[in-house]
């Protein structure tokens, strides 16, 4: 395992879309706390997650500052990957001049090292020591075999990569110098760290371009011809085969590119379906010119192929072939193995995921795994979270919604913008005398209610709260709240049956009115009695007054 994490995560950008795990050919990504984490021991540095991430949440560790520090202390030589022509759209002479302006002592094409490697391949085929021989130029392919097909390590050509071969040559020619490989590949950073005696640093074309821009170095477009540059074809699919002398009729020469296609070939080799073959194997579709950093630029692969074809010569670079032992390479068994749980444990996880029976296993792949079973195993291994299952989350959400709506004391209706019923809860069904939910779902709300209020809310985009209505069709009073969901374009209606409350209120009003009427009658009667008493008292008083007056007069006369 490399000490450095070359593909890193911007946590703030990760939005749990699971696109990276869906596209990772070896599922070397785990999710924890809603964040993607690369499993270094499992990663083959194909860069697929970096390319595919829609949020740009992955970034590549830059070695630019390390290279700048080299330039202050040492002579530094560049091994430039032949795919530079497709990235910078210029020839090697212009690139050499630009790199010298940055302070590099010199630059050569890695294609020189590719010549050494292809000569070694030809020699191995000539010796016929291997039934199946796989090219070992692509570090991602090497890691794929080392980690996932260690039983096929004997098929890997025991030869250094063009980068290693060339950087060794540069170090021999310039003792004490530092070497920097510059190319389109992320996995070369990992390879360099594993073989530090050959390569001191690896920069991507992106890093170099940023440095040129920083120094305001403009590279002219100039393409010089060079007849002896056949191995400039190495970065295109089938390019290695095109440079090789194929003089062994017993061997079939095959080319395969793309990690998944490589894995299919490796499965066939494992099962003994392929014999007497030399296989050029590249992890990137289109080989190096289809690498992760090339794809990010979005140029068409056909244009890149044409550039490579036009720039390559007809003959090999003139280079002394090193001794076989000096370019020999042994590949370590880096097998990545994980514990596969017992069937009972897998079933337990599936049950927790809501997969109670086989029909529940949708195998939709939204979580990034090919099947629900594979996802359950990943959950058990701690690589995946239960919540990564979209159908599971949806079901959980729907279950929660069902619980809320089904147990609500109010009638709930959900309508679309065409006023069609999308959902109705049990209280609403009872209120509107609906026996079968299917009879109303998808039907116009006009079959059960006057739509005017809903139309008004939709037109004005203004919610209505606790509006009192009398539904004459059902002889009930309701308090109606209608709100519009702009995001999902739904009208949500809640109705509270207040018929009993209204009746109680009407009864109270009637009692109060009756009581007031009785009180008025009593008051009126009392007033009458008072008036009668007053009248009688008045008459009596008058009679008494008359009698007393007469008595007074009679006494006075005497």
List where the protein language model places each region.
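Sensory modules in modular signal-transduction proteins
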Residues: 396-429
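PAS-family sensory/regulatory modules and their coupling/dimerization elements
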Residues: 451-500
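Short, charged amphipathic alpha-helical "coupling" segments at sensory-output junctions
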Residues: 386, 390-407, 504-511, 522
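PAS-family sensory/regulatory domains
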Residues: 437-452
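PAS/PAS-like sensory domain cap-loop motif
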Residues: 428-440
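Iron-sulfur-associated redox domains of electron-transfer enzymes in respiratory
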Residues: 61-337, 341-351, 370-377
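Iron-sulfur cluster-binding cysteine motifs and their immediate structural context
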Residues: 6-9, 15-39, 44, 48-63, ...
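Sensory coupling linkers of modular signal transduction proteins
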Residues: 484-529
């Amino acid at each position: 395992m490399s000490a450095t994490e070359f593909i890193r995560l911007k946590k703030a950008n990760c939005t749990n879309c699971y696109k990276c795990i869906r596209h990772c050919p070896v599922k070397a990504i785990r999710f924890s706390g809603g964040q993607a984490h690369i499993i270094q021991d499992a990663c083959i540095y194909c860069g697929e997650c970096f390319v595919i991430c829609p949020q740009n949440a992955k970034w590549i560790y830059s070695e630019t500052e390390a290279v700048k520090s080299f330039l202050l202390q040492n002579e530094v030589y560049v091994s430039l990957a032949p795919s530079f022509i497709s990235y910078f759209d210029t020839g090697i002479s212009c690139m050499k001049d630009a790199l010298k302006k940055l302070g590099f002592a010199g630059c050569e094409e890695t294609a020189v090292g590719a010549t050494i490697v292809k000569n070694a391949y030809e020699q191995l085929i000539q010796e016929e020591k291997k039934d199946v021989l796989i090219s070992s130029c692509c570090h991602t392919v090497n890691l794929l075999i080392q980690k996932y097909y260690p039983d096929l390590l004997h098929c890997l050509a025991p030869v250094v990569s063009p980068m290693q071969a060339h950087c060794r040559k540069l170090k021999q020619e310039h003792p004490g110098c530092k070497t920097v490989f510059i190319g389109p590949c992320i996995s070369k950073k990992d390879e360099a760290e594993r073989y530090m005696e050959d390569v001191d640093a690896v920069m991507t074309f992106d890093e170099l371009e940023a440095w040129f821009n920083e120094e305001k170095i403009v590279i002219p477009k100039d393409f010089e011809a060079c007849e002896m540059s056949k191995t400039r074809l190495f970065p295109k699919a089938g390019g290695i085969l095109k440079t090789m002398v194929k003089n062994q009729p017993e061997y079939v020469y095959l080319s395969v590119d793309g990690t998944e296609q490589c894995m299919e070939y490796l499965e066939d080799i494992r099962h003994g379906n392929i014999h007497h073959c030399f296989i050029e194997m590249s992890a990137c579709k289109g080989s190096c010119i289809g690498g992760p950093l090339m794809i990010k630029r979005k140029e068409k692969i056909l244009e890149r192929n044409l550039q490579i074809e036009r720039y390559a010569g007809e003959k090999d670079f003139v280079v002394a072939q090193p001794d076989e032992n000096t370019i020999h390479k042994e590949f370590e068994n880096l097998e990545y193995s994980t514990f596969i749980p017992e069937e009972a444990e897998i079933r337990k996880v599936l049950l927790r995921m809501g997969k109670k029976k086989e029909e529940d296993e949708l195998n939709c792949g939204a979580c990034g795994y090919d099947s629900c079973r594979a996802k359950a195993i990943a959950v058990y291994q701690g690589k995946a979270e239960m919540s990564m299952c979209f159908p599971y989350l949806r079901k959980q959400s729907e279950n929660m919604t069902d619980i809320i709506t089904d147990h609500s004391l109010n009638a709930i209706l959900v309508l679309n913008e065409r006023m069609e019923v999308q959902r109705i809860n049990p209280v609403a069904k009872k209120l509107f005398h609906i026996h079968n939910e299917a009879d109303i779902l998808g039907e116009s709300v006009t079959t059960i209610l006057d739509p005017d209020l809903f139309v008004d809310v939709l037109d004005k985009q203004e919610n209505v709260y606790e509006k009192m209505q009398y539904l004459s069709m059902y002889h009930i009073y309701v308090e109606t709240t209608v709100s519009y969901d702009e995001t999902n374009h739904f009208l949500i209606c809640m109705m509270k049956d207040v018929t009993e409350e209204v009746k109680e209120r009407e009864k109270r009003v009637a009692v109060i009115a009756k009581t007031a009427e009785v009180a008025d009658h009593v008051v009126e009667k009392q007033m009458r009695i008072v008036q009668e008493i007053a009248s009688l008292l008045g008459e009596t008083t008058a009679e008494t007054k008359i009698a007393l007056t007469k008595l007074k007069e009679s006494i006075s006369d005497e």
